[in-house]
C-alpha cells in the first residue's frame, strides 16, 4: 500500500471515512500502522445517516473502535432527503457534502478493486459517459484544497477480508448490503458472479478498460484545462475566444469553467442552452443552484447569489459620517492609487451611497456620467444601480469605488476605496 500513498502526508490533516464496515475498518487500521512509521496521525469521520434502526449502534461501534486504536473520531449526523434521487444517491450526496464541510487535506475512502468493477458496470447499465465509465480515480481533488484518496483500489474484497482475519479486526455488517432491490447489490451478488463464471478473467478485463478510460479522460482534461486557460487568459471568460473552438470543445470548456467556479454542472440540455445563448445572443442570464451566470459585453460572469445579495448593502440608503470610518466599517480597503483621493478628504465628513443618474466625475478635463463610466468598463447592468460611490458632505461625487476618483480632487499616490466583493476596474 506504500506505493499508493500521495506525496507528503506529514503535516496534512488526514481523515478516514469510517462506516464501521469491513473495508473502512481495515483502512483505518492500515493507516494507523503506516502513520506510526510515517509520522502522521489520521483521524476518523463517521457519517450518521439515520437510515437504519441500528445507526446509533454503528456510531457507538466506530467510537469504540477508534478508542481502541487511539485515534480521534468525529460523528456527523445528516438528514437524507431524496429530492428526486434514489436513497443511495441522496445519502451519497449528503455524505460528500459533510466531508467537504470538514475541510480535510486528505480524505481516505475504503473503495477496493471489486467496488471499482461494480462502479464501471453500473455506469454501463445507466448509460454513463466517459467520466462515469472511468469509475473511481485513486486520487482526485476535493473541496477547495483537499484530495480524496482511495488506497485500497489495488486490493480485492478477499484481500481485505484476509487482512481483517489476520489482525482480528471487528466490523459491522450493513443489512442493506444483501438487499438485491438495490442495483449495486444485484451486480455484486448475482450478475457479476455469473459473468465471472462464464468469462475467464472478466474482472481483469473490466479493470483494464477502466485504466484505459482513465488515461483518455486525463488527456481530455489536460486539453480542456489548456483551452479554458486560453479562453480566460485576459482574466475573464472571453466569449470571442470561446467561439473559435469546435462545438465539442466549447461544451467541455464551459463545463470546466463552471466546475472551476464551484457551480454544480447542469445537465446536458441546460449546458447546450447556455452554449446556444453564448453563440447567438449578446446577453444572457441563468440561475444555477445558488449561482447567477451573466453573459454581457462578450464576457461570462459568475456570481454567488448570497454574495450578490451582500452587494446590495447600500440599496435604498446612504451612510453619512467620517469617510475613513464609514468606508472601513463597510468593508472597504483604502488602496493606494496614482490618481486617488488625498488623505485629508478621508478625515472629513461625507456620504457613502449608490450611484445616481445625475452623478458625474471630472475625467481628463471633461465631466462624464458615472453610469456611462461603468458601462464603458463593461460592468454588468445588474451591478450598476448598486455600485458604491463616495461623495462629500454636500453630496458631490468624489470617487467611484473600485474605479477612479474625480480629477478635481485627485492627487498622485492618493487613496481609492476598494470593496473586495465588487470587480476591480483599474
From Swiss-Prot:
The organism's place on the tree of life at top rank: Bacteria
Cellular component, GO annotation: cytoplasm
The protein's Enzyme Commission number: 6.3.4.19
Keyword Nucleus: no
GO molecular function, one term: ATP binding
Annotated GO biological process: tRNA modification
Entries under Gene3D superfamilies matching the protein: 1.20.59.20, HUPs
Classification via SMART domains: TilS_C (SM00977)
Subcellular location: Cytoplasm
Positions with a binding annotation for ATP: 19-24
Top-level EC class as recorded in UniProt: ligase
Coiled-coil zones: none
Note on domains (UniProt): The N-terminal region contains the highly conserved SGGXDS motif, predicted to be a P-loop motif involved in ATP binding.
Family under the similarity heading: Belongs to the tRNA(Ile)-lysidine synthase family.
Function: Ligates lysine onto the cytidine present at position 34 of the AUA codon-specific tRNA(Ile) that contains the anticodon CAU, in an ATP-dependent manner. Cytidine is converted to lysidine, thus changing the amino acid specificity of the tRNA from methionine to isoleucine.
Protein name: tRNA(Ile)-lysidine synthase
Organism: Neisseria meningitidis serogroup B (strain ATCC BAA-335 / MC58)
Lineage: Bacteria, Pseudomonadati, Pseudomonadota, Betaproteobacteria, Neisseriales
Amino acid at each position: 500500500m506504500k506505493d499508493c500513498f500521495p506525496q507528503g502526508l506529514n503535516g496534512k490533516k488526514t481523515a478516514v471515512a469510517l462506516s464501521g464496515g469491513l473495508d473502512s475498518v481495515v483502512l483505518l487500521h492500515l493507516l494507523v500502522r503506516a502513520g506510526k512509521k510515517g509520522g502522521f496521525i489520521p483521524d476518523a469521520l463517521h457519517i450518521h445517516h439515520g437510515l437504519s434502526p441500528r445507526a446509533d449502534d454503528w456510531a457507538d461501534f466506530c467510537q469504540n473502535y477508534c478508542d481502541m486504536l487511539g485515534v480521534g473520531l468525529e460523528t456527523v449526523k445528516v438528514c437524507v432527503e431524496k429530492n428526486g434521487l434514489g436513497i443511495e444517491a441522496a445519502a451519497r450526496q449528503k455524505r460528500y457534502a459533510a466531508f467537504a464541510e470538514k475541510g480535510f487535506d486528505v480524505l481516505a475512502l475504503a473503495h477496493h478493486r471489486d467496488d471499482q468493477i461494480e462502479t464501471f458496470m453500473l455506469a454501463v447499465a445507466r448509460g454513463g459517459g466517459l467520466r462515469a465509465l472511468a469509475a473511481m480515480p485513486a486520487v482526485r481533488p476535493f473541496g477547495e484544497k483537499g484530495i480524496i484518496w482511495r488506497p485500497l483500489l489495488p486490493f480485492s474484497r478477499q484481500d481485505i477480508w484476509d487482512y481483517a482475519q489476520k489482525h482480528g479486526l471487528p466490523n459491522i455488517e450493513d443489512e442493506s448490503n444483501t438487499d438485491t432491490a438495490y442495483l449495486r447489490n444485484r451486480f455484486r451478488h448475482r450478475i457479476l458472479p455469473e459473468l465471472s463464471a462464464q468469462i475467464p478473467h472478466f474482472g481483469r478485463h473490466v479493470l483494464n478498460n477502466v485504466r484505459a478510460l482513465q488515461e483518455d479522460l486525463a488527456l481530455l482534461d489536460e486539453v480542456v484545462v489548456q483551452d479554458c486557460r486560453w479562453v480566460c487568459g485576459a482574466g475573464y471568460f472571453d466569449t470571442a475566444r470561446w467561439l473559435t473552438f469546435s462545438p465539442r470543445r466549447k461544451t467541455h470548456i464551459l463545463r470546466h469553467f463552471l466546475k472551476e467556479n464551484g457551480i454544480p454542472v447542469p445537465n446536458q440540455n441546460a449546458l447546450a442552452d447556455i452554449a446556444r445563448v453564448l453563440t447567438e445572443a449578446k446577453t444572457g442570464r441563468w440561475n444555477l443552484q445558488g449561482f447567477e451566470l451573466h453573459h454581457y459585453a462578450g464576457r461570462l460572469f459568475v456570481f454567488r447569489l448570497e454574495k450578490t445579495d451582500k452587494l446590495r448593502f447600500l440599496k435604498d440608503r446612504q451612510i453619512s459620517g467620517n469617510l475613513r470610518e464609514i468606508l472601513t466599517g463597510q468593508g472597504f480597503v483604502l488602496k493606494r492609487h496614482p490618481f486617488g483621493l488625498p488623505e485629508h478628504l478621508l478625515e472629513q465628513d461625507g456620504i457613502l451611497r449608490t450611484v445616481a443618474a445625475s452623478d458625474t466625475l471630472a475625467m481628463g478635463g471633461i465631466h462624464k456620467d458615472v453610469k456611462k463610466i461603468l458601462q464603458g468598463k463593461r460592468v454588468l447592468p445588474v451591478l450598476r444601480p448598486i455600485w458604491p460611490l463616495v461623495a462629500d458632505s454636500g453630496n458631490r461625487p468624489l470617487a467611484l469605488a473600485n474605479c477612479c476618483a474625480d480629477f478635481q480632487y485627485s492627487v498622485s499616490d492618493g487613496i481609492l476605496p476598494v470593496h473586495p466583493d465588487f470587480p476591480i476596474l483599474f
